[in-house]
Amino acid sequence: MGNFFENTVAWMERKGLASKYRHAGIYCIKIDTDIVYIGKSANMLRRIAEHYVGIKTGSEKKYRILAEARRRGHPITFDVLYYAKSKGIANQLAEIGEKEGEYIRHYMPILNTQIPKAEDWNKYESKSVDE
């Protein structure tokens, strides 16, 4: 996966996506215009590259679902929902952890299997991804 992953990061950089995604924040994956997954990362560029690799390799159920949607002609896109405002990695991770929970509880994306609790984003309820 390492080589394919690094090639994917380089491809995203060539496409001019580094300035948008090389930050800590909250991102989403969409099928058509519907948000189907929300995640957080200290470096969204690298995390989104991991998702591209997952879709290509079908390494998890959510990626197989996304690959099938793409195969059927539905566009799969990524977008930024929130950029971390805090300074320092520990503060950024706490900030985006809390914000991610807010976004997941608001949108209830079908591919998120962990729903962070409002009172403590480190605790969550689990659900399965139905086929």
Kindly give the residue locations of the regions a language model identified.
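GIY-YIG nuclease catalytic motif and its immediate N-terminal context
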Residues: 1-46, 91, 122-131
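Generic signature of intrinsically disordered, low-complexity, basic-rich segments
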Residues: 4-6, 63-65, 114
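Conserved short loop/helix modules at catalytic or binding sites
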Residues: 44-90
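Serine endopeptidase catalytic core focused on the charge-relay Asp
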Residues: 99, 103-104
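Coupling/hinge elements of helicase-like and P-loop NTPase modules
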Residues: 108-122
